[in-house]
C-alpha cells in the first residue's frame, strides 16, 4: 500500500477515534482533517471521501440523527476551504481553519434553532441559540487550531524528512 493511501486511512482512523474517546465538547480533529484532506488530496473526491468516512465510521458507534446531516455539511465546508487554500501558504491555511470553525458554528447552531425544539422561531430565539453555542465554539476553535497545527505541521516535518512525500498524497 502506498503512502498516500496509508495517510488517508490514518486520517480516518484518527478522526473516528478522537470522536469516540472522551474529549472536551467539540475538541476533535474533524475540521482540521477536512481542511487538510481538501488541501492535500490530488482530487477533491478523495478529500470528501476521507472526511465523510471518518464521520460515518464514528457515527456507527455514536449514532446518527437528523442533525447529523448538518455536521456532515459543515465538514464538507472544511474540505472546500482546503481546496480553496491550496498553494496559498500558511496564512491561507490559518484563514481556512478559522473559516471552518466559524462555518461549523453557524451551520450547527442554525440547525439547532431551526429544529424549533429548544428555541423559539424568532430572531431573539436565533440570537439566544448562537449565544448558547459560544462556549462550544471556544472548544471548537481551540480544537481546530490545535489539530490544524498538528496535522499540517506534522505533515510538513514528515515531508522534510522523507523525499517520497513531496508528491501530493
Where are the predicted features?
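Central hydrophobic cores of alpha-helical transmembrane segments
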Residues: 11, 47-57, 93-102, 167-169
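Interfacial aromatic-anchored transmembrane helix boundaries in multi-pass membrane proteins
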Residues: 17-28, 52-84
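Hydrophobic alpha-helical transmembrane segments
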Residues: 5-10, 45-49, 69-73, 94-98, ...
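Alpha-helical transmembrane segments of multi-pass membrane proteins
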Residues: 11, 31-35, 71-79, 145-148
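Structural signal for the C-terminal ends of transmembrane alpha-helices
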Residues: 17, 37-43, 80-87, 154-162
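Hydrophobic transmembrane alpha-helices
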Residues: 1-39
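Helix-boundary and loop/linker segments of multi-pass membrane transporters
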Residues: 1-5, 24-25, 85-86, 121, ...
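Membrane-embedded alpha-helical hairpins and interfacial helices in multi-pass inner-membrane proteins
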Residues: 89-168
Amino acid at each position: 500500500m502506498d503512502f498516500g493511501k496509508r495517510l488517508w486511512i490514518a486520517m480516518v482512523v484518527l478522526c473516528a477515534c478522537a470522536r469516540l474517546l472522551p474529549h472536551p465538547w467539540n475538541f476533535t480533529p474533524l475540521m482540521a482533517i477536512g481542511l487538510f484532506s481538501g488541501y492535500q488530496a490530488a482530487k477533491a473526491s478523495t478529500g470528501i471521501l476521507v472526511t465523510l468516512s471518518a464521520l460515518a465510521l464514528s457515527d456507527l458507534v455514536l449514532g446518527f440523527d437528523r442533525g447529523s446531516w448538518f455536521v456532515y455539511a459543515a465538514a464538507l465546508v472544511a474540505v472546500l476551504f482546503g481546496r480553496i487554500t491550496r498553494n496559498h501558504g500558511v496564512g491561507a491555511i490559518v484563514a481556512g481553519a478559522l473559516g471552518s470553525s466559524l462555518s461549523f458554528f453557524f451551520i450547527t447552531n442554525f440547525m439547532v434553532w431551526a429544529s424549533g425544539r429548544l428555541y423559539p422561531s424568532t430572531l431573539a430565539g436565533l440570537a439566544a441559540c448562537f449565544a448558547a453555542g459560544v462556549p462550544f465554539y471556544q472548544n471548537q476553535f481551540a480544537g481546530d487550531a490545535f489539530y490544524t497545527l498538528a496535522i499540517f505541521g506534522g505533515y510538513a516535518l514528515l515531508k522534510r524528512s522523507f523525499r517520497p512525500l513531496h508528491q501530493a498524497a
